[in-house]
Amino acid sequence: MITMIMSILKKINLLIRDFFRYLYFLINKGGFYKIFFLENENTYPYLAEIIKRNISRKKRILIFSQDKNIKMKISLNLPILILETNFFSEIFFLTLKAKYLISTTTDLDTSTIFKKTLNKKCRYIYIQHSHIGLINGYREKAFINFDAVQIINKYQYEDMKEINKKYFKKIKRFKFN
């Protein structure tokens, strides 16, 4: 009984903390040009070079994560928003104002929290972190809601062509070295 009560109190504490983090973000931070979504600390190495290349530009950048340990991984002087609850993370995704959202997470609009924003001007870019095929290695519709997908081999290139054809999409393919 005490364990259950402690668990409930911990969840309530997380909700309250996320509420104030999100409120602070809304009041003080405003819109961003690019938002990098780091699902957890393990995805940072795949986005690190892209983030560093974007720092020198005069555009506002935000790093968003659900992993509270991400701050220890990142030594860059960038704003970091951490929302640990799915509830506030979903609200963040639905209301974000940015030109680009860059992520290594698939299943945009088909997962529990990773949703497209109500702001139709935001472009979603998927950064590849695996050499596996896009059709056999992921869920069937894992990429159909992205605007651009990084391709790192010829198999992924062919898979992306097939996905575009099957779902009548025009998802851009690009290579990043």
Protein language model regions, located:
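Extended catalytic core of nucleotide-activated donor transferases of GT-like folds
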Residues: N69-A142
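A generic structural signal for alpha->beta connector loops
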Residues: K58, N77-P79, K121, F146, ...
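Short, surface-exposed basic-aromatic patches at helix termini and helix-loop junctions that form
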Residues: R53-N54, K116-N119, K141-F143, K165-F168
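A nucleotide-sugar donor-handling region in carbohydrate enzymes
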Residues: S7-F19, A142-N177
